[in-house]
Structure formats: structure tokens, C-alpha cells
Amino acid sequence: MIYVDDAGLMKHDRAWFHLVADSLDELHRFAATLGLPERAFHRGARHPHYDVPDDLRQRAISLGAMPIYTRDAVRISRKLRDR
């Protein structure tokens, strides 16, 4: 399953959100569908994710990503990281 949170962190005059998934393969495939390059993946982060701006968040949801709270995105990412 693919998820996108409600973080809405402001950076460069845009709101940014976290795209996470139950598996890295699924996450990378979905990110590619959105046009995100793999280099945009936060590989060194404590929680594996891609940052997406609001327009891509809306597109992700229309393509099947489940909107979730940020705390749930952190939990999902930690579980993935700890595998």
C-alpha cells in the first residue's frame, strides 16, 4: 500500500508531504509513476520516504495513495526501515 501524509511542511514557498509505502519496491515504483527520480528518495533519513509537493500529493491520492496522518507515516516508515 502507498501512503501520503498531511505534514504540509513549508519549504521554498511550497507545502511538502511524505510519500511512504509498505515496501521499498512499491514505493520506488509509485514514485516513478509520479515522475520522481530515485535520487529524490531520502535514503539517509531515519524514515524512508520521498518528499512530494501539494500538486503531486493530490495526484498520488488520485492514483490510489491513501492519505494518512504524519504520525502514521512515521510508524509505517520505521517498520519498513527496521525490516
Feature map (PLM): residue ranges:
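Short, compact, well-ordered microdomains
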Residues: 47-83
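Generic signal for short, ordered secondary-structure residues
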Residues: 9-10, 38-39, 83
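Non-catalytic peripheral regions of nucleotide-handling enzymes
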Residues: 3, 13, 27-33, 59, ...
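Terminal leader/tail segments of proteins
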Residues: 2, 33-40, 57, 68, ...
